[in-house]
């Protein structure tokens, strides 16, 4: 149970952090406080100061220190990346892609666009006995 909670918290913090700071393959933006996603390896790079500022604004109750956050989020440090020194990185979790979720519609399934769907809500028409002229 504890492991699940830790993983959920890790996922949540990383998702919020990446969504608010991410740039793709623009490593010159590291110094400007962005998280840079290497699209080939699905690894995100960032400066410790960027994470520190994010934690102070959004996740101060979750982690006591930035070092604790780096450890729990399973971040690693590299001395040098694309011209920047002391860069941290973490593999980006698979986030839900909102565009890829589409409900497949069965051709035989009725929808609100079909007349037959609305027929069930309409009062039934009773046939009145026809009067014949004699």
Show the residue positions of the predicted features.
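DNA transaction DNA-binding modules
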Residues: 1-134
